[in-house]
Regions:
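Short, T/G/N/S-enriched strand-turn elements that build extracellular solenoid repeat scaffolds
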Residues: 56-61, 78-87, 94, 380
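Bacterial N-terminal signal peptides
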Residues: 16-28
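Right-handed parallel beta-helix/beta-spiral solenoid domain characteristic of secreted/periplasmic
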Residues: 72-80, 91-139, 397, 407-413
Length: 482
């Protein structure tokens, strides 16, 4: 699935942790448009696996800082039949013709990545789709089903799928992409990829050892499977994470030992804007889990976290101080499962371990589905932690909350494509969330340009701003909560 073109970003002052992270990764941020082909360019003349004029041959002749031009090919796919293309230089750029125009693929059972970069520096892959890379090691760790790099990785305008890693009893990471340094993804779809091992596992689709920037992208259908410890069903970031206008959905971390972060696991500062994390599964933190660390922080603005599952904190397992603005956290659930012990104290929406500031946010309809009659609050935690903020709508909380908190059913519609590049929960007419929120300095709601943050007397609570003139009064109870 190709996401729409990047949306213009609202002019907002960066929050402190977002500013620090933006400075740290500014040099590696991916451009939206294709970069012009720089000097010292090697042109690929055919789609053969090897030999003169092939991509493999061009890489073999490249030096540090070179670019390889694949835009002049008349063919649409390159099949690698003799193993991975080995990259031994720094700062290499592979420039393709664009999304869906050229596919680099393996056989799915070769035991090798597609691109294996030992050179370090920044590897850039622009406008090239990747599929059926399969990294397998029986005697050592295995990393990067489609791309492995010792350095930083920048991928732009690409569809990546059916990449796998298997490491027998050794560690495995990055079912599709693995970078020991930082990683930048812009207008990238990664899906139906994963890793399996009897050892530790990190990042069902993405492993970014030094941090990640994810923009206008979708990571979906990834699986992290281990009998030991697994972190990050979709994405593992060993540093900070900055994510904007992206979807992390339908990923699974089903490790039998200790599985954290069905969608995302982040070890550093976590900044998420205008994004949706939905229908992911793990034992701890169905949508998002982080390292237990009070020196870093989580910030979530104008985003939706919905339909995720875990035995502990199926929405967010907040092992860092957390700030949430103008967001919707709903319909996350704790399943009754022999392999997934339930910890009701942490809440079905958010489990707090450090301080929390929540403003103009809906946290509701987060539940346990079992037959024993036990319930979990939308907000919980290991110890009492007073929640700061204002203008929120919750259905229940085991933590002290601001005095102006509204306790009511927000009457949310099902998660759907309501415009913009990510899915949202619309609110029905008559919802207590309408005109009761704060705009937070945002010009638009989660959907971006064209969806004003204030359409009525004041902003609505949550990630979605209803249009009072377009809401059907007959849908007040259409969600079945009448």
């Amino acid at each position: 699935m190709r996401l729409p073109d990047p949306l213009p970003l609202p002019c907002l002052p960066l929050r402190p942790l977002a500013a620090a992270f933006a400075i740290a990764l500014a040099l590696n941020a991916a451009p939206t448009a294709h970069a012009s082909v720089p000097p010292h360019t090697l042109v690929v003349g055919n789609c053969d696996d090897s030999g003169a004029g092939s991509l493999r041959d061009a890489v073999d002749h490249a030096v540090d800082g070179d670019a390889i031009d694949l835009t002049q090919l008349s063919c649409s796919s390159i099949s690698l039949t003799t193993g991975a293309i080995l990259i031994g230089v720094e700062g290499l750029t592979l420039q393709g013709p664009g999304h869906h125009a050229l596919m680099l693929h393996g056989s799915g059972d070769s035991g090798a990545s597609l691109l294996y970069d030992l050179g370090g520096g920044l590897l850039t892959v622009d406008g090239i789709d990747l599929s059926f890379g399969a990294k397998y090691r029986s005697d050592n760790a295995a990393h990067g089903g489609c791309i492995y790099t010792n350095g930083d990785l920048q991928v732009t305008d690409a569809h990546i799928y059916a990449c796998t890693v298997h490491a027998n009893t050794y560690p495995a990471s990055g079912g599709a992409l693995h970078a020991y340094g930082s990683m930048s993804l812009d207008n990238v779809t990664i899906e139906n990829s994963g890793l399996t091992t009897f050892g530790t596992a990190k990042g069902g689709c993405v492993f970014a050892g030094g941090g990640a920037v994810i923009t206008n992208s979708r990571i979906s259908g990834c699986r992290n499977a281990s009998v030991d410890t697994g972190v990050g069903g979709g994405v593992y970031s060993g540093g900070s994470l900055l994510m904007k206008y992206s979807m992390i959905d339908d990923n699974e971390n089903d490790d039998a030992g200790h599985a954290e972060g069905g969608g995302l696991y982040v070890a550093g500062d976590t900044t998420i804007y205008w994004s949706t994390i939905a229908n992911n599964r793990a034992n701890f933190g169905g949508a998002l889990a982080t390292r237990f660390d009070s020196t870093h922080a989580i910030f979530i603005g104008e985003s939706t976290i919905s339909g995720n599952e875990a035995g502990t904190a199926p929405g967010i397992d907040a092992d860092m101080p957390i700030t949430i603005e103008n967001s919707t956290i709903a319909f996350n659930r704790m399943p009754r499962s022999n392999s997934t012990p339930l910890d009701y104290s942490f809440g079905a929406g958010i489990g707090l371990r450090w301080s929390a500031t929540i403003t103009s946010t809906i946290i509701a309809n987060n539940v346990i589905y079992d037959d024993d009659g036990e319930e979990a609050a939308d907000i919980g935690g290991a110890i009492p932690i007073p929640v700061a903020g204002s203008n929120n709508l919750f259905m229940s909380s085991a933590q002290p909350v601001p005095a102006d908190t509204i306790f009511d059913d927000p009457h949310l519609s099902p998660l759907a494509d309501n415009g913009g590049s990510t899915w949202t929960h619309a609110i029905y007419a008559g919802s207590a969330a309408m005109d009761r929120g704060l705009d937070g300095g945002y010009a638009s709601d989660q959907r971006g340009a064209g969806f004003a943050r204030i359409r009525g007397a004041s902003a609505d609570i949550g990630a979605f701003e209803a249009d009072p003139d377009a809401v059907d009064p007959d849908l007040i109870f259409a969600d079945g909560f009448d």
